[in-house]
Amino acid sequence: PKNEPILTRNFLVGILIEGAIIALNTMIAFHTGLYYGAGMAAGAATVGSTMAFATLCLSRLMHGFNSKADHPVLFQKEMFNNRYLNLSFLVGFALLSAVLLLPLKPLFKVVTLTPMLYGVIIGCAAMNVVEIQVIKAIRTHLKKKR
């Protein structure tokens, strides 16, 4: 509606919930890095920080797909129909990979991780998409009931 503010109550609640989900999955990645990084030469805190950084970056890239619509778009053509969003995701992923896998590591103070830990990063970031899409499905269902 014309007179409705940009930041409505529902919109702010959605932002808060989505931010909390991303934060929770980032903390899970950090604590996983602390646990598995204890035996690594780089040290547990550095491994945990690297995992949190990578998870947060990848989560924000993936969150662009979540932000396309108020209704769930997971497993629909609509999810990938914006070529500029797809391109920006790929560029962002390439930049993150350059930070994690190439000689840019010292600049960002990140360390080499095991393949399993990279899998945890991807898993935690992907879980954000799934969890937020489920919440959007629930919210859409509840709106229809009203």
Q: Model-flagged regions — what are they?
A:
Residues P1-R146:
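C-terminal transmembrane helices and immediately adjacent loops/tails
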